[in-house]
Amino acid sequence: MKKTLISAAVICAVCGSAYASDVTLYGVVDTGLGYTYSDDDVAGESADHEFAMVSGQSAGSRFGLKGTEDVAEGLKVGFVLENGFESDTGSLGTAGKIFDREAQLFIDTAYGKLSFGRVGLLHSDAGSFGMMGDLSAFGTGWADIIGNQNMVFAYKPARMDNTVTYVSPDFYGLKIHAQYSMGTSSAKTTTDRTQVENESSTNRYFALGASYKIEALELYGLVDYVNKASYSDLATDSLAHHGKDQYTVTLGGNYDFDVAKVYLAAQYFDNAAEVGGEADETGFDLAKNDKAYGDIEGYGIVASTAVPVCGGSVKFTAGYMHAESDKTNKKANRWTAGAGYQYPVSKRTNVYTGVGYVQDSVNNRDPYAVQVVAGLKHSF
């Protein structure tokens, strides 16, 4: 009888481990201080100064749940639910969305991983699938300016709803990445049009990329395309600003020399509605992290490095962008530079500080901005 009970217990234990489920609570709290000085180089206008407590300067503050279950041999099902919040105020990162950073269900097999839901785009450093974080020592940037690739690359949202993502198995260091977003659905308001998922009233996103990792070398390539909305039921919305469909080609990589890790990335963009930061209908005003508005063609280059120093990491970066807007009949050149230091005070906590500079040359103006930040980041 004892042998039978022992055998049954062993069988149950084996079955339990073979088809085990696992759920993890995790998060990041990043809070710091930031000072920004910006001068638009416009006669009669004063420069702007801003000093504030800021959340997520080196990494977005968040908490999340993730879990997996082995449902059969070679078949795993999992999920990620991640919320972004402002650690300085306690508010949601995105109004109306509790899991704004990620909400996905995935299937993982020997043939690759297939994901469904709201996730970070391949052309981002966000979530489970973003590729851009490996192209810079600063990821996709600290604060608004320091090391921010989006300051010299075409802008896209970091995340999109209703997205299907596929990542292939590892073939001797090579992986294929593919993604399609059906866009979003939203009701009509006095200022916004109706958007219907996977129809011409919403922007849709396609991307195909590859990554190759072998020893100290990592290489990345990505082509992505935005099928811009072309229909509106809002009388005041002509969709003129949407223009032609946007595409970008991004190449880059990094190499770890032990004494320093070096990064290089370049991007060509065409028909981009926005480059730099936030939308600005008047055209280029980029030093304040604004985007140009129109069908923009151009390119950007970013180089950076991370050097181990005194138990931490010293980071340097420099970037350049040239962009032309046929719609606004403007050309712009942009230069960026940044430096930072990150020091781990424990396994899960680090302190950081950094400084960044950006300057434009556009329409006989040379606007510029300087940013200085310092903060504390804790992961759990």
Predicted segment positions?
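Gram-negative bacterial Sec-dependent N-terminal signal peptides
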Residues: 1-21
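Outer membrane beta-barrel
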Residues: 21-35, 50-185, 202, 211-218
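Detector for outer-membrane/organellar transmembrane beta-barrel domains
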Residues: 207-338
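Repeated loop/turn-to-beta-strand initiation elements of outer-membrane beta-barrel proteins
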Residues: 75-77, 111-115, 173-176, 216-221, ...
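Gram-negative outer-membrane beta-barrel proteins
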Residues: 33-41, 85-91, 122-124, 184-188, ...
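Outer-membrane beta-barrel "beta-signal"
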Residues: 368-380
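Transmembrane beta-barrel strands of outer-membrane/channel proteins
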Residues: 29-35, 81-83, 118, 178-182, ...
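Outer-membrane beta-barrel architecture
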Residues: 9, 64-66, 104-108, 165-167, ...
